[in-house]
Amino acid sequence: IFFLFSCEKSDDNKIELFVSGAQIAGVNGMHFGPDGLLYAASVIGSDISIIDTETNEIVKRYDLSDGVIGPDDVAFNSKGEFYWTSILTGEVAGFNVKGEKVIAGNPGPGVNPITFSDDDRLFVAQCFFDNGLFEMDPSGQTAPRVIKDEIGEFCGLNGMDWGPDGRLYGPRWFNNEIVSVNVDTAEIRKEVGGLNVPAAVNFNSKGELFILDTGDGKVVKVVDGIKSDYALVELGLDNLAIDANDDVFVSSYSEGSILKVSPDGIEEVLPGGISHAGGIAVAGNDLI
């Protein structure tokens, strides 16, 4: 936010930085690429930022000029190609190994989480605008396959990951639970209940399940069906990602921050701040 101290022409006029915002306009889905860098999607910012979590720097950014439109989540296949979902338009697209944009299809607005299986099958689900689960053709040559056209009220699945049992795991936002899906038979099984507002799941290399419960502002760890609080963070969280060292990172849609979290504490990767301000007003001595 900048303050302009006068509207009259004068050599004394100046623009002063009053408060700086977040480096990303609200962080949504995240995924570590084969290069070890963290790829973070932003719907409001309409970009995908690539972050070095060792130096805490944004090293590259894909935006509208690259054909990235309102991305909500991002995922990689075994070739190193990455795809994203555009929640507002319904487009599912990616960049192939040549760096060319490829449109996989459009199952409709609300496409939110995205993931590749180990054999490079592409899956997306809808949340908030609709509630379906689909398999997509990454090349866009065949229409999306409907696995389930209604998984949960107002939201199918959010941030998804593959379990060690080969099933697709994901949170049902409004149902306070985690389910798994057999993507070939569409059979759904409840895995974890008693959550507040689960937003995302991820497995580490040991096969341990981590859940981001955005309603309670915390990360929950599940081992042998037993839940425990892994890290108490803050409200306004959106998604989580786990790196090759099993370190856990969470994103904030409200603050635009990325945090590394553990039972020992919280480390800032990207600090939060004003991430999508809509206006400004002054009331007495208060800036609103």
Predicted regions and their residues:
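Beta-rich, blade/repeat-based domains predominating
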Residues: 22-35, 65-80, 91, 106-125, ...
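A short beta-strand motif characteristic of beta-propeller blades
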Residues: 14-21, 57-64, 99-105, 142-151, ...
